[in-house]
């Protein structure tokens, strides 16, 4: 391992940590991510509306011990895009995404950012681009749910 790779690995391991109950702790941003995206958890593609409903279902179940899972903002989703790291999407393609997350996720991630009540932003992990898409479009729709870490969680 070259010195640059060692530094990058240390930065990543300082930022992310495996949490309990299928979660990943993001120390840099104060977030708790689900290790699996909605495609991996449900086995089906979801549009934006269904993604929000899915988060509500997990909240009712207190998935991972929490009831405040939500769609990420564009900024939060984009923060997982990292050209220094590699992971595999659902098609087995190598993408620039934090490697601590379980491989096999959807490469397009719905976010909470909306426009005109009919479009939402999807962040693409293959090229690191964001696009507006119809909130009812299901094509390869998935998201990685997230929550803010609270002081009383004892995770930071």
How does the language model describe each region?
Residues 1-70, 75-156:
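Glycine-aromatic-enriched surface loops/turns that form tight recognition elements
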């Amino acid at each position: 391992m070259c010195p640059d790779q060692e530094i990058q690995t240390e930065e990543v391991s300082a930022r992310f940590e495996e949490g309990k109950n299928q979660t990943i702790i993001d120390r840099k941003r104060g977030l708790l991510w689900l290790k699996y995206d909605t495609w991996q958890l449900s086995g089906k593609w979801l549009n934006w509306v269904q993604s929000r409903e899915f988060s509500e279902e997990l909240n009712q179940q207190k998935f991972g011990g929490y009831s405040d899972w939500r769609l990420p903002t564009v900024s939060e989703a984009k923060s997982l895009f990292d050209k220094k790291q590699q992971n595999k999407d659902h098609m087995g393609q190598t993408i620039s995404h934090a490697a601590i997350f379980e491989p096999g996720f959807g490469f397009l991630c719905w976010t909470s950012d909306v426009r005109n009540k009919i479009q939402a932003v999807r962040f693409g992990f293959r090229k690191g681009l964001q696009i507006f898409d119809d909130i009812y479009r299901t094509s390869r729709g998935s998201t990685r749910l997230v929550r803010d870490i609270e002081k009383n969680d004892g995770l930071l």
